Regions:
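Bacterial N-terminal signal peptides that target proteins for export
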Residues: 2-9
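A glycine-rich, acidic short-motif signal
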Residues: 3, 17, 21-201
């Protein structure tokens, strides 16, 4: 009987070690975008992530990790995400994401915008608690990043929270946006201007 117990304990410990090893390996194979931008360009969806300069998990330089690639375009949000992910050296883990920025061009294309929201609701690609805002040209926001003390996603999160605290309006998070759009409730977004955003924090 004691022999069987020892074998069982050894088996359990082996499985635990295997699982721990897999988790560590999976973590090393992930990258952690802090924000996402989605816009419409020349009749197609434009999509990309914003990453921290240094990985928050292992302090790996972005160039070394080879995760910071240019935005991509495609006919649908799904095809854009697939194309972008295929260009990454690591799996994009969006659980730490702070902000989702839509472009004004996308907002004006109501059909394409509705398709994007439908895709996000069906897939759960991004956390429901991330902030959502709009920019005339989301990609222009990246041009300000070199002058920032932190990654753009974390910076925008703090900026939006400061704006809300100052009484500049109620912020929308993705979960609420998806729910209210489904119920046909009008939504008022926070609009960003690249240089104004940089000055106000």
């Amino acid at each position: 009987m004691k022999g069987k117990i020892k074998k069982y304990v050894a088996l359990v410990l082996s499985v635990q070690q295997l699982l721990c090893g897999c988790s560590a390996t999976e973590l090393e194979d992930r990258c952690f975008p802090m924000m996402a931008v989605v816009d419409e360009k020349d009749g197609q969806i434009s999509f990309g992530y914003g990453f921290p300069k240094l990985s928050q998990k292992d302090n790996t330089d972005l160039e070394e990790a080879r995760v910071n690639i240019a935005p991509v375009t495609g006919k649908t949000m799904e095809s854009c995400v697939q194309t972008y992910d295929s260009g990454l050296e690591k799996l994009a883990d969006c659980n730490h994401m702070k902000v989702l920025v839509f472009g004004e061009n996308l907002m004006e294309d109501t059909g394409r915008y509705a398709d994007v929201l439908s895709y996000l609701k069906q897939t759960g690609l991004f956390p429901r608690n991330i902030y959502v805002c709009v920019a005339e040209d989301p990609l222009a926001l990246f041009e300000t990043e070199e002058d920032l003390p932190q990654d753009l996603g974390s910076y925008l999160e703090q900026y939006l929270q400061n704006q809300e605290s100052a009484g500049s309006g109620k912020l929308f998070k993705l979960g609420r946006l998806l729910d209210e759009k489904e119920n046909h409730i009008p939504v008022s977004y926070t609009h960003l201007r690249a240089h104004e955003t940089l000055r106000h924090l």
